[in-house]
Amino acid sequence: MSLQIDAVILAGGMARRMGGDDKGLVELNGKAMIEHTIERIKPQVKEILINANRNQTRYAEFGFTVLSDEHTGFLGPLAGMITAMGHTQADYLLVVPCDCPLLPRDLVARLLAAIKANDAELAVASDGEREQPVVMLLKPSLRESMTAFLEAGERKIDFWYAKHRFAVAAFADQPNAFVNVNTPEQKQRLAAEINQS
């Protein structure tokens, strides 16, 4: 029996460092940032969900289910993850941010391999130096634990997953895979990299 793996693209943040622009909709090389992300992960998963707290109609134009946080008040990535975990029947949920256009094309395979090798509940990606807390594969059954953590006033994803059996999948061979866009300057640099990839 093959596993079902769905994905959620997190596009629910305030993007303060981008002057408040909705990062997923910022154009990069003629496409919305989220389109680059969709292209990278679509072959790796069954269903894609988009977590967005504004411009929902615009996000719906990409052809996927759009979910807004069940917990109101822009509470960060955990709120979007909790919402998505409540809307999937999959065995695993892939979590990625909307502003990482160079995500690995073998992201799911390597995260899943790390889970199996370590008998873990979730796997987090690493660029070889640092863990990437918003790039992970996890069991949706962890929703209750994550909800309790958020409702206790906690926000840091790495503090949450440290409480669970987690594995790290290293992508040191793809050092730019998790480069994201927080400033207009980073956007310019990334545009040049995409042209070369």
Curated annotation (Swiss-Prot):
Binding site for Mg(2+): D99
Record has Zinc as a keyword: no
GO CC entries: cytoplasm
Reaction equations catalysed: Mo-molybdopterin + GTP + H(+) = Mo-molybdopterin guanine dinucleotide + diphosphate
Names of required cofactors: Mg(2+)
Enzyme class: transferase
Keywords: Cytoplasm, GTP-binding, Magnesium, Metal-binding, Molybdenum cofactor biosynthesis, Nucleotide-binding, Transferase
Any one GO MF annotation of this record: metal ion binding
Pfam family, one: NTP_transf_3
Domain topic, free-text comment: The N-terminal domain determines nucleotide recognition and specific binding, while the C-terminal domain determines the specific binding to the target protein.
Name the record gives this protein: Molybdenum cofactor guanylyltransferase
Gene name for this UniProt entry: mobA
